[in-house]
């Protein structure tokens, strides 16, 4: 157990991208982004991500780019800038087909019915939305109404993610997010009434005062609502990055051994309810597109987690939003003032990014295959990975990883340590390891 504990306590990225965001630099700006956009083929398929960095209040555990707002004016002002950014992008990449659209935050539904409609209308005027396969939005179940769900159905939303984290009252008090099971069930019902039947529920383990039984009970209650997908994320305690997390006493956070038990117990419960484990921390019903893609080897991973999205480019809209194009990554200004200033200055909002090399793309493929399918055939890829395999030797000896000379596979026992296996192929990690969260 001591070796497992040491592994679990390692600081490694979640690998929603490679290279990861801490390595982005100001060497990539609006000019490079405009060139990359202009190089997209006319028939390129796009995925759009819209970031709304506002919430009615900030939960203590939150690690998102967001801030509390209690007045309407800042939200309206921001929504106007989103519309301006869409128009700016359309000057370069108008008419491209959009296959996936995701609203994140923050709480994107805080925009309200008017702006949700207006922004979709702006997108429709700028891009081809006729082939959208998935139109998803993140929702705070504490703030949902019939007007909101009707608007979501009207603009074409077909998947909703509900942030729950834990149903236990004492854990909810500890994280500053009170939402009884009945409130979440009500939100699911409202979504079903308007035909939005693809529901995701997000849970967390590793929260303050949370036991393995708490996580297990929350998994059971979530499964009783029959969502198509359930995510079980490990809480990332990074108070050096997120000031709100400084309000959480580290003494009441579960240790590594308990975190492992929490994740394992919940996974067993979800399996008993018929959910299939997807990658590191997702679960889906067998007929859900995510489960089908996993079986067929078509699963991908991006900044929203596991996805079936295979678009050629991801376009990020809004403050802090990240995009991915064939040439590399771009990120908008993280701070609100910087984002507004750039948009008002008739510029793209890009402030940093990363131009990827052939070697970066090769390693990104290895990491994605490990994170998605828990296996990769290194013989299919050019390169010498003997040093990486040597670093994984202890995990092979412990039965967490198997290697037959070409195919590297993470065992069932090793699944919780998938990020560590992926990290062996991260050429940039040593310089910034301390900036990431624990592996489990």
Give, region by region, the residue ranges found by the protein language model.
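Local cysteine-cluster metal-coordination motifs and their immediate loop/turn environment
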Residues: 50-66
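Short amphipathic alpha-helical interaction segments
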Residues: 382-397
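Minor-groove-contacting beta-hairpin "wing" of winged helix-turn-helix DNA-binding domains
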Residues: 407-411
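Flexible, acidic/Gly-rich N-terminal and inter-domain linker regions that tether
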Residues: 1-46
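C-terminal scaffold of the Radical SAM
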Residues: 38-42, 68-92, 96-383, 439
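Short, amphipathic alpha-helical interaction segments positioned at domain boundaries
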Residues: 413-440
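A short, conserved structural fragment
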Residues: 396-406
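Divalent metal-dependent hydrolysis catalytic cores, especially in the metallo-beta-lactamase
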Residues: 47, 60, 135
